[in-house]
Amino acid sequence: AGQHWLMTLRLRPVHGQLNDGGFDSQRYALAQHRPLSGGIVAASALDARCSLRARYLTSLTRRLQTYPWRAVMLGLGMGERLSLPTEIKVLMQNTGTSHLMAISGLHIALAASLIMLLLRGVQYILPGRWIGWRLPLLAGLAGAVGYAWLTGMQPPALRTCLGLAVCCALRLSGQRWTACQVWLCCLGAILVADPLAVLSQSLWLSAFAVAGLIFWFQWLPLPAGRWRWPWKTIIALVHLQAGVTLLLLPLQLLLFHGVSLTSMAANLLAVPLVTLLAVPLILTAMLVHLSGPEIVESLLWLAADRVLAVLFWGLRRLPDGWLTLDARWLWISSLPWLLVMGWRFQSWRHSP
């Protein structure tokens, strides 16, 4: 990657097969800004030097040769999913955890948060006039953009950076916006910057998930209780995952023609392990790989590898939960939305 080539190409517009229920390759290609397909007739290298990202990726690949879960670590850290074994891809698809392998909001927001917390911690030793919230906020945004570039600036990563930039601008403006207004502003900014994103399934999955969570926490919030840690954290995680699982059913059925019956259990295991352990360890190891002690880097990679081993051990113990459904189930899958609204309005008290 990063090389410059002079090529003679034979190109044609990309097209799909138009099979009902099949994968729409034309829509996917246009969403990825690849409207043409074809073959190479002749090629000659103008500049054979690889980009900085490609050299860093090559160095990481050599460093991880001895770890069993190196392909997953490269996928989580750099967004490289081509080397993932087919078995792992099928397992994550059947358990509804494929979203964890995409460099999107989860990873980039986590990287930005780590940079913000690091800079905020450094401010404790600085004079009072140098302490403020704006510098860590902007540093987190810059770190998010840098990490997105390092992972290849894929469309989901680019959309996340645009959303973070909008949120930072709103925060710096000092105005108070509701969650729905922020959601609409971020979605509008993404579509203005990339109109072809309207064809992307990943955009609508992300947007629908965020809208569903806003709806879930506003219409069916977790009741205040006297739970203590760790039960309070566990109940909050179950409440969050239940909302995502139930409210995304209509869109999953519409896009993928099926649902995963084990997705909630799988995500209850996978999301904490990946978010709180695997990804922070991988990001720290990637940073230490640049100049840190080799023994520290080895320990970080080993810890991340063992966390992933535990994760996939648990996922393999789950039954095959993928259930193929047709469009007749679409209205039934919308019942969670209707039930939440009915509960909120207490409509049974007013019904005859």
What are these regions (language model features)?
Residues 1-4, 40-48, 52, 76, ...:
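N-terminal secretory/membrane-targeting helices
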Residues 1-99:
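Membrane-interface helix/helix-cap signal primarily in integral membrane proteins
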Residues 38, 88-264, 329-352:
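Hydrophobic alpha-helical transmembrane segments in multi-pass membrane proteins
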Residues 46, 50-51, 79-87, 151-157, ...:
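Hydrophobic alpha-helical transmembrane segments
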Residues 53, 57, 61, 231, ...:
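Membrane-interacting alpha-helical segments
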Residues 67, 72, 157, 241-257, ...:
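Hydrophobic alpha-helical segments of membrane proteins
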Residues 295-352:
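C-terminal regulatory/interaction regions
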